[in-house]
Amino acid sequence: MPSIDLKDQYFGCEIEMTGLTRQQAAEAVASLFGTNAVHSRSSRTYDPWEVTDNEGKTWRFVYDSSIHGSHRTGRQQVPIGDGDYKVEMNSPKLEYSEMGKLQEVVRTLRHAGAVVNGSCGMHVHVDASKHTPQSLKNALSIMYSKEDILFKALNVNESRVERWCQKVREPMLEKIRKLPSNTTMDRL
């Protein structure tokens, strides 16, 4: 059975931040790409700002109520109740070759004033379309075996582990491992 090469894997990121508004974040990234930031009225809840990159992919900056907003006053971050400072960036579907683009977007946001605090987090969505049931079983087993090391290295706040970034549960892992080898992706 062929393995999945990391370089063939599609992914997307959600990165939470504060220190700047959704509009400021979108305008900074639009400047990087030489395009425009657009205030989309598609959702009153998430109040999205959108930027299209040079490949026609859309980067979104949306409201996230879990973020504790702040803004810079001099050299200090000061808490602020203004929801505009609660920013979650949603990347488009990216290829491995676009990792540099993602890094440049993050650097651009940092230079524009983006910061993180204990309420901010990130996660990565991994495209499963090229996976097989066996490769997903393998990925889950690897993640389970390395979770504690990753969480410690990343200094993940325990309250976030409880609520937002829960670890793989052993009963679920065992259930997946016991699936027959002829299990289809639809069955998974």
Task: Tell what function each PLM region has.
Residues 1-188:
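Phosphate/nucleotide-binding catalytic core
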